[in-house]
């Protein structure tokens, strides 16, 4: 199937959450994902069948091959460098596998939308956040070292990334 045919058959997702989930397997909870919820009606992988897990991985791989460039995957990998130990999602391994076979680019907001949803509550201190920002070149304001202030920063950043991702996907006709 040629690339144009694949594009013409792109599904229309009912919400930004499902669209991001299908594209990146973005977890909604520690062991769950938007796509697993959409596929199984559950809140995590625990209630999914083996076939559903395989189907989810296939969707993520397809989306990454279609929409991410090697440069985008390097950005994702840099972000994951700080969270590999806590990762329970196969996206880390998929990104390594797919890195050299991705034909085209995707806006950075897509990457941010995924990463912020996945790791907002895993970043425990401002020092980690500052290092993350320096390594990726993504500016994140630092309000202070108290946890409440850090949470406010992360929540504001997460909301902005999701708004950007939703607008882009709406413009492309991927969500209603």
PLM feature spans:
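N-terminal interaction/assembly modules
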Residues: 1-74, 78-105, 125-142, 147-176
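Short, leucine-enriched amphipathic alpha-helices that occur as contiguous helical runs
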Residues: 72-73, 108-117
């Amino acid at each position: 199937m040629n690339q144009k045919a694949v594009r013409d058959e792109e599904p229309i997702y009912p919400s930004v959450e499902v669209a991001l989930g299908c594209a990146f397997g973005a977890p909604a909870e520690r062991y769950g994902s938007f796509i697993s919820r959409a596929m199984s009606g559950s809140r995590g992988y625990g209630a999914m069948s083996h076939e559903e897990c395989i189907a989810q991985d296939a969707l993520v791989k397809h989306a990454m091959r279609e929409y991410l460039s090697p440069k985008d995957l390097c950005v994702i990998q840099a972000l994951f460098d700080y969270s590999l130990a806590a990762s329970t999602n196969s996206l880390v391994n998929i990104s390594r596998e797919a890195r050299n076979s991705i034909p085209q680019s995707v806006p950075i907001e897509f990457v941010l939308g995924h990463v912020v949803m996945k790791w907002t509550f895993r970043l425990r201190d401002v020092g980690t956040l500052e290092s993350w920002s320096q390594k990726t070149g993504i500016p994140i304001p630092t309000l202070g070292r108290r946890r409440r202030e850090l949470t406010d920063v992360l929540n504001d950043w997460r909301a902005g990334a999701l708004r950007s991702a939703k607008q882009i996907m709406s413009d492309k006709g991927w969500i209603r």
